């Protein structure tokens, strides 16, 4: 029986040895307990609330390159989703009192009350990513000072799967680089 208990303690000790090492409280030179997590709390930043608006998926990233957009388009088409382009003027892109359709007591941040204009029709049956990229270029050329986003729909589930910006107007002042998003 003692052997069994010994074996169990060895097993438990091996399991404890596999667990990651977390910062432990240690005594500093003044005799007070200190913890590395306290230092991390001091390094926390405050989110910059001004001119720091986001749009859907990938908004926290810098603007996507053409190559990155192409990879996203390939992923959309590989899943048999339908891509669609939408655009909106700078002053109409965000939810607000001026650009929302009110149908009763609805909050101004309710997303379904704000519509972007569709660029042509959804690209039903599209299998070539270059077609989508050429439509993005055509829309950007036609509306250079508008926000343009690519959304995709799943016909089976009948829902929007994803949406992300593919063009931000050069005059937009609402975007901050990731390093400038906190103070």
Swiss-Prot record:
InterPro entries for this protein: RuBisCO_ssu (IPR024681), RuBisCO_ssu_dom (IPR000894), RuBisCO_ssu_sf (IPR036385)
Disulfide bonds: none
SUPFAM superfamilies given in the database record: RuBisCO, small subunit (SSF55239)
GO biological process terms on file: photorespiration; reductive pentose-phosphate cycle
Highest rank taxon of the organism: Eukaryota
Main location: plastid
Subunit comment: Heterohexadecamer of 8 large and 8 small subunits.
Misc remark: The basic functional RuBisCO is composed of a large chain homodimer in a 'head-to-tail' conformation. In form I RuBisCO this homodimer is arranged in a barrel-like tetramer with the small subunits forming a tetrameric 'cap' on each end of the 'barrel'.
Alphabetized HAMAP family for the sequence: RuBisCO_S_bact (MF_00859)
Role according to the record: RuBisCO catalyzes two reactions: the carboxylation of D-ribulose 1,5-bisphosphate, the primary event in carbon dioxide fixation, as well as the oxidative fragmentation of the pentose substrate. Both reactions occur simultaneously and in competition at the same active site. Although the small subunit is not catalytic it is essential for maximal activity.
Name of the protein in question: Ribulose bisphosphate carboxylase small subunit, chloroplastic 3
Organism of derivation: Acetabularia peniculus
């Amino acid at each position: 029986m003692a052997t069994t208990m010994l074996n169990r303690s060895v097993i438990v000790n091996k399991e404890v040895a596999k667990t990651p090492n977390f910062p432990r409280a240690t005594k500093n030179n003044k005799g007070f307990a200190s913890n590395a997590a306290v230092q991390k709390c001091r390094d926390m930043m405050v989110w910059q609330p001004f001119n720091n608006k986001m749009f859907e998926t990938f908004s926290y990233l810098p603007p996507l390159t053409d190559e990155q957009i192409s990879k996203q388009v390939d992923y959309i088409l590989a899943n048999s989703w339908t891509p669609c382009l939408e655009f909106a003027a700078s002053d109409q892109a965000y939810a607000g009192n001026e650009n929302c359709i009110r149908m009763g007591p609805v909050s101004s941040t309710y997303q379904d009350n704000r519509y972007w204009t569709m660029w042509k029709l959804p690209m039903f049956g599209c299998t070539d990513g270059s077609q989508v990229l050429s439509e993005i270029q055509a829309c950007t050329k036609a509306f250079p000072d508008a926000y343009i986003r690519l959304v995709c729909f799943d016909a089976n589930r009948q829902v929007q799967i994803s949406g992300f910006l593919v063009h931000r107007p050069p005059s937009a002042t609402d975007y901050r680089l990731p390093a400038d998003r906190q103070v």
